[in-house]
Amino acid sequence: MSQSLRIIFAGTPDFAARHLDALLSSEHQVVGVFTQPDRPAGRGKKLMPSPVKVLAEAHNLPVFQPSSLRPQDNQRLVADLGADIMVVVAYGLILPKAVLEMPRLGCINVHGSLLPRWRGAAPIQRSLWAGDSETGVTIMQMDVGLDTGDMLYKLSCPITAEDTSGSLYDKLAELGPQGLLATLAQLANGTARPEVQDESLVCHAEKLSKEEARIDWSLSAAQLERCIRAFNPWPMSWLEIDGQPVKVWRASVIAEAAHAEPGTIVAATKQGIQVATGDGILSLESLQPAGKKAMSAQDLLNSRREWFIPGTRLA
């Protein structure tokens, strides 16, 4: 068993809560938890705590919710806990240099990619969209840059042809805690071997936008099929029909020449609505009109066949 460490945990969403849960079941002592302030959510816009806050309070841990760690008073909250290390997982706030240097072993971060590939806010979605064959998690020593610190530990997993960002998120949420506990053991025992990132291999995973999720029919069918999986469950790929946004949950590639302008419906069957793209045909198999639940192409054709007349050009 490795030496027990005094840990500050900083994180916000469910992905982070799964890492906190692993720490709470370990030999280490979580001395305080930092998470984002409660946010309005739902139709009533009621203030809701983060998943990390809910878990921390269930274990009677001290919870801190500053909107920034730049003020010295907020930095003092970190210093006063006397931690050996700070573990950061999808926290959402920038840690100033002073905070990074406060714990004896500094601050480490669990990142959802195999660095230096996909530094940034949306590594899971970008790796899927790019057609990567594998991804994973990297535990790194944090510095003042964006995901630029030395790498301490990596675990990888394959990306399958069926993966969505939702399924990949779940895979990495299983790998992350394993890698985190292994890294903490190495740091506690003095056996960690930091590895500098190769700057020649860097690529960036910019934050996603809803407008970016609008289907661009000039892309190839293969690119669009990956995009649909990458943007599921958020922000969801979408197209516009009759002035209404329609989300696309699932599609497949038909490797045939379309012989039509990109965006043209070439066939509408119960198996899927076939649309010409920049290269090949994309078959839309599960769609969700505004205000409705997701449904099969067959069910949508039964109610809205006029939307999908072959020869119609989608925006």
From Swiss-Prot:
What residues bind (6S)-5,6,7,8-tetrahydrofolate, as annotated? 113-116
Question: Which superkingdom does the taxonomy of this entry point to?
Answer: Bacteria
| Top-tier EC class | transferase
CDD domains given for it? FMT_core_Met-tRNA-FMT_N, Met_tRNA_FMT_C
Q: Which reaction does it catalyse?
A: L-methionyl-tRNA(fMet) + (6R)-10-formyltetrahydrofolate = N-formyl-L-methionyl-tRNA(fMet) + (6S)-5,6,7,8-tetrahydrofolate + H(+)
Q: Which GO terms describe its cellular component?
A: cytosol
| Gene3D superfamilies to which the protein is assigned, alphabetical | Formyl transferase, C-terminal domain (3.10.25.10), Formyl transferase, N-terminal domain (3.40.50.170)
GO molecular function (one) = methionyl-tRNA formyltransferase activity
Q: What is this protein called?
A: Methionyl-tRNA formyltransferase
Gene for this chain: fmt
